[in-house]
Amino acid sequence: MSNLKLTLACWDYDRTRPLIDGRVKPEGIDLDIRIMRPREMFPRMLEKKEFEVSELSLGSYVTLKGRGSCPFVAVPITLSKIFRHSCIYVRTDAGIKTPQDLRGKRVGTTQLGSTGTVFMNGMMQHEYGVALEDIHWFIGGLDSPTSRPVIALNLPEKVKVDFLSSNQTLEGMLEAGQLDALFALYIPSIFQKGSPRIARLFPNYSERERDYYRRTRIFPIMHTVVMREDVYRQNPWVAGSIYKAFCEARDLAVDGLYDTDALRLSLPWLISHLEETWRVLGKDFWAYGLKPNRPALEAIGQYVYEQGFSPRAVSPDELFVPDM
């Protein structure tokens, strides 16, 4: 019997590269892999269901599950993870020295419902007592104008939000002093250029992130992998095959990092970084599956509810195909 042909949309990570270059092949499946940035991929999957299998924003997936309108089934592949303490930028003249100083300030972000921003706001509320409604939000493109979110936010009335006009950008407003702070998933160019007017809220973000993980066990998950529900219903075995292949690809990527013969990545202290990661997160630091990721999954389910994107808190046990 011939293999099932499926499209897979994902970004070109070290942990997907073995799938892309053919070193790893899912059993019984021929993948037509479409490599694209998440900001292009996610709208195409959410609006058009364009791919049979796709990387997807975890926040969007949890929101749709909570609303009872999700056309996807997720596999417990936590494809993208990142701590977000480094992603909050402030004007040095805005009087913001602590997270609590963000109350009443004008803060920009590209999307309030994006997973990264949801995690940042969840951290603000649970770690520092700063709720979503304590801030005046401005939503728009970071360095170029952008359209409104794909998924309607349905924010509570108490949350104050303004959308940027067609000729405004978040970076431009921050540089001009029209914003006091920025929650940015990408490093702003004005910060990269060394503007003295822009600084990170947490200059010691690496130490903060390690402490946050030790206390909460949360390694924030940004993206998962989903299948269209019709594909899963017709071929439920596909979920297991996809999961196994992604695990094998990740193992090849991670195992290749610990090699002092010839460094796999262009980082001079790669081995030191890896050994420090083991000390903090353990050897299985990029674990897939429900059990090792439960703290982060419980957090995102709670945050999307608290921030008004979902009418209920979604349990981790609801998120993925069973028995995996």
Indicate where each model-derived feature is located.
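Pocket-lining segment of extracytoplasmic ligand-binding domains
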Residues: 148-258
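Immediate post-signal peptide segment of exported/extracytoplasmic ligand-binding proteins
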Residues: 1-7, 96-106, 280-281, 306
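Short helix-initiation/N-cap motifs at beta->coil->alpha
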Residues: 34-44, 97, 135-149, 153, ...
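Short, glycine-/small- and polar/acidic-enriched structural segments
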Residues: 14-133, 137-144
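Short hairpin/turn module used for nucleic-acid contact or packing/dimerization
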Residues: 296-324
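Secondary-structure end/capping motifs
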Residues: 226, 231-306
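Short, well-ordered beta-strand segments
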Residues: 7-9, 108, 138, 182
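Extracytoplasmic "Venus flytrap"
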Residues: 6-16
